[in-house]
Every structure is written in C-alpha cells, then in structure tokens.
Amino acid sequence: MAQLTQDCFAFGKKLIKLETALNKIKKNIKPSKIIEEINISKSLNRIVATDIIAKKNIPPHSNSAVDGYAIIYNEYKSGNRVFSIAGKSTAGHPYKQKTKKLATIKILTGAILPIGYDTVIMEEDCIIKNKSLVLPNNIKKYMNYRHLGEDIKFKNKVFFSGHKLRPQDIGVLYSLGVKKIKVYTQLKICVFSCGDELTSIDKPLKKGHIYDSNRVMLVNFLSKLSYKVQDLGILKDNKKHITKKLNNASKNNDFIITSGGMSLGDEDHIKPLIEEKGEMHVWRLAIKPGRPVGFGNYNKTPILGLPGNPAAAFVTFLMLGIPILKQISGQKLIKNNYLPIKINFEHKKKPGRKEFLRVKLSNKDNSLILKKFHKEGAGILSSTSWATGLGIIDDDIEELKEHDRINYISFSELLS
C-alpha cells in the first residue's frame, strides 16, 4: 500500500501556489515498488517496472521495402544494365539457391534479400526484355533496401522504467516477441462524495438535492487511467459516519479521493478528520477554480480532498490529482506541453492566483484560437464537456485582451 513519509508541511491562512504544492507533495510520496509480471496482451496503460532491452534486431534480416527486382549494386556500378532473372523471393519464402553473376531476383515487399544483394528497383521502373531485366542509368545503392535492425537494434533500450504503455508500444513489444512484461501493480483507489444534498442517480431527486456528478466523473477518470477503482458512494454530513467509512477505506486501498467537505463550514468534516487521523500536507491553493483542495494522509493512506463544486473538482483532479497518482504508481513524470495560443475574448482576474479557464481550441482563418465558455463558475460542469482543454492565466496577470496569448493544454494530454 502506498504510504507517505511523516514530514508535515507548514500551512496557514496564506494560499499555496500550485507549483509549490506539487513540489512539496512529490518530495513526500513514495512511488510503488510492488512489481508483477503480466501477459503483454493485458498491458495497455500499465507502467513498465524495468527497462526493456531488445533481444533481437527489428527487422531481423535485411529485406525489400517494395515489390521489384534485387541486384548486387557493384555489378550494376561496373556498367552492366542487363540481368538474368534467376528466381523469386517472397515474404516468408526466401530465395535459397546460389545465384550466378549478373542475376537478379524478383522480390516482394518484406521478403529477405539473398546474401550480397543490396539494391531493389521498383517493379514499375523495370523493363523486362527476353526474360531479362534491363535497368536505366539512375539506380542508387541501397534503393528500397531495409537494413537489418534499422527499426530496433539488438540490445538497445526500447522502453524505460516508468513508461506508460500505449497501443503502439504493445505492437513494438509484439514485434520483439515479448510475451510477458514486468509492471508496477495497479493502485487501488476508492472514491467518495460528501454532502447530505447529494443523491445517487437510482433514487428520486428531493427538493434541495442534486445528483452526485463528481463521484461518477472521478470513477470514470480513474478507470480510463487504468487504476483499480472502488466507488464507495456518498458520505453523510456526519463526523461519526465519515470516520467509520474512511477508517475502512484506509485499510483496503492505496489512495482515497473525496469531493466536498474541504472548506470550513459547520458540516465540512474531511479536513478536520485528516488532521485528527493523519496529516494535512497541503490545503487551500492559489488557483481558480479549486481553492478548497487538500492533500495529506489518513491513517498513513494518501488522501486527496477535492472541492465539491464540479468544475473545481474537475480542474483540481487534472492539475493536482493526476501528477500525484502518476508518481505514486511509478509513472515517469513528463513536463506538460503548454502551447501559447491567441484568445478571442477579454478577461479580468485578481492577481496572486492562477486561473484555469475551460476553453475550446478552434481554427479561424487557418490560425489556432481559443474560445472561452460563456460561464466561468466553479459549479458549471457543462463547461468541462464543451471545452477541449484548459487555458492557464498566470498569477501576476490581471487583464487579458483579445488576441493576447495564454498557455493551453488539452485534456487528452493531461490524461495521457
């Protein structure tokens, strides 16, 4: 089970910058060291636990990149232009006989080249006369020739420890003949929502109640990221009830995520319980939306307390939750690729906090431009569905004008 070190970060009324919070957290969480070996067919989105070294060359032999005719270039270079056709080499059925001088082999794409043959002329560029191949004067050595190991060389590192496997990566491993692979075990993560006003979708909605959208959103995010997820339902605004549920969750999971209950209201119990049962490492970030977010440990189990407002929960999960989970799960952290893109709107904000706008990347007059959702509140969940990513406005900026540039990052990259 993933655990935190016992260091506690000092915090007070001052808001913490997101970057500061992440740096503090990264220093105090221990990546998973539990490794298992699994079939490569079941390795999608799993994290490689040891460097993978190529045990063979890919391709394993020199072969033809096209359908055509193979020759020995030095014979052509000597001035010869007419070659007798000795035989045929096809994929899976190489030509095995010895060849005479000035002989060509008809060859199909992917077929092995006979020893010494190093140049292939495309069939449509060839002239056949009297059962012989007649070549033009513009042939170059190694035309259409795939060298042994030109894709992957024997003993080269193919993937480093910490790499998250994608479909194309699995294809590469199959090409190398890898059947099983060592990966870090999947984190077991449980998700709660907090609040007496929340209702599950299978129950009728009472006056003053809302359906619990945060929990299902987070569960689906985590499933997409290939964690083992347990949906533990809604926590009532009752300290005794919450304590019992969190006690059980901390015994059976590697990580706990809650939404709601992180502010200072009379019925906000999550933060006080974290402080009572463990440590609150980070609380209240200088961001919008998502200020009432916290991270700590509950009975030595890492716990992330997200805001109750759905758009705020969405943003803080992407910007704080995912980096934490990546590190604990053993995934190599790669710096986000932010793109400076022009905006088609004006915007004002308070200095001292970073803002994350839900924006859509569009193409106008062959130029990329960002559009902002028409409402910005922390409770506007529809903005997250409309948007393609986040537009980030730095702490010190107070005003943006149309055609200014802001940093943009897509949801797909954040979830990669």
Give the predicted meaning of each segment.
Residues 1-6, 10-18, 179-306, 310-316:
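Helix-rich terminal scaffold detector
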Residues 1-79, 131, 333-358:
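Short, low-complexity N-terminal leaders and the immediately following helix N-cap/first helix
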Residues 19-22, 36-41, 50, 92, ...:
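Flexible glycine/proline-rich
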Residues 13-20, 35-42, 66, 80, ...:
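Conserved active-site and cofactor/substrate-binding residues in soluble primary-metabolism enzymes
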Residues 26-33, 51, 113, 156-163, ...:
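Structural signal for hydrophobic packing residues in well-ordered secondary-structure cores
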